[in-house]
Amino acid sequence: MGSKTLPAPVPLHPAPQLNYSLLRTLNAFPVAVDQLYGLSALHTVQMNRWTVGFPQLQGLADPRFPGALPFPAAAAHLLPHKHPVHRKDRPRFDFANLAVAATQEDPPVTGQSRLSPERRPARGRLPAKSKKEFICRFCGRHFTKSYNLLIHERTHTDERPYTCDICHKAFRRQDHLRDHRYIHSKEKPFKCQECGKGFCQSRTLAVHKTLHLQTSSLSAAAAAGRCFGATATCGATV
C-alpha cells in the first residue's frame, strides 16, 4: 500500500471569529467595542489558529499583531499596567500569649520614648498642654499668670508705682489707687445689700459683709439654743 499524505487537521466546528477593527471601520460596531480588554488581539490570535483550512478568512486578521506571537505577548500592551500594591506587614496577634501581653507594657514607639512616663499621652487621647508656671524668684511660689507674679513680687520689693496725686500715697496695684480716690471725692459707690451702708473701697465692703455673716450665724445659734431649752423644759414638766 502506498503512503497517503494526510491534509492538515481542520477543526470540526471552528468558532466564527471576526476582526473587530475591520468591523469598526465599516461602522458595524461602536468605537468602544475593540477597547474592551484587548479583544482585537485575542481574536487575532484565535484567527491565526483556526484559519488553517480556511484561507478566505485570513484576510480578516488584524495586521498589527503577528500570528507567531503568543497571546500574552500580543495582548500585554493593551491591558492596563497595574503597579504592585505595597501592603504593610501587620504583626500577627499571638493568642497563646494573651495573658502575658495584657500584663506587659507596650514597646515604646519612635518619638514617644523621649517623653517621661507622667507626660506620655494615654491611649486614644492627645497630650494635654502643660500650664505655664511663673515662679517667684524670692520665695519660689508658683503662679499661672505673669501679672499675679508681678503683683506678688512687689510684696517682697515693696514697690509702689501708683501714687495718689492728692495725698501722694503710693499703692502696689492700680485698682487700689482707684478705690483710694473715692475717699477724696467723698463718693461711696460700694453699697451693702443688707443694710445699705456705702463704702469707698471694695475691700472695706467685703470686710463689712463678713460682719453680717457672723451676726446672722450667732443669731441662728442663739435661736437654736432657745428652742432646745424650751423642748427640754416641756419634757421635764411632762
UniProtKB/Swiss-Prot annotation:
Residues 105-126 are annotated as: Disordered. GO terms for cellular component: nucleus. Disruption phenotype: Embryos show a down-regulation of early pronephric markers lhx1a/lim1 and pax2a/pax2.1, and subsequent defects in renal structures. In addition, embryos at 72 hpf display pericardial edemas and kidney cysts characteristic of kidney failure. Signal peptide: none annotated. InterPro entries: C2H2-ZF_Transcription_Reg, Znf_C2H2_sf, Znf_C2H2_type. The keyword Transmembrane does not apply. GO terms for molecular function: DNA-binding transcription factor activity, RNA polymerase II-specific; RNA polymerase II transcription regulatory region sequence-specific DNA binding; zinc ion binding. It comes from the Eukaryota. Keywords: Developmental protein, Metal-binding, Nucleus, Repeat, Repressor, Transcription, Transcription regulation, Zinc, Zinc-finger. It is found in: Nucleus. At the 8-somite stage, expressed in the pronephros, with weak generalized expression elsewhere. At 24 hpf, expressed in the kidney tubules and the anterior duct, and also in the gut. At 60 hpf, expressed in the tubules and the pectoral fin buds. A zinc finger (C2H2-type) spans 134-156, 162-184, 190-212. It holds the Pfam family zf-C2H2. Transcriptional repressor. Required for pronephric kidney development. This is Protein odd-skipped-related 2. The lineage of its organism: Eukaryota, Metazoa, Chordata, Craniata, Vertebrata. The gene is osr2.
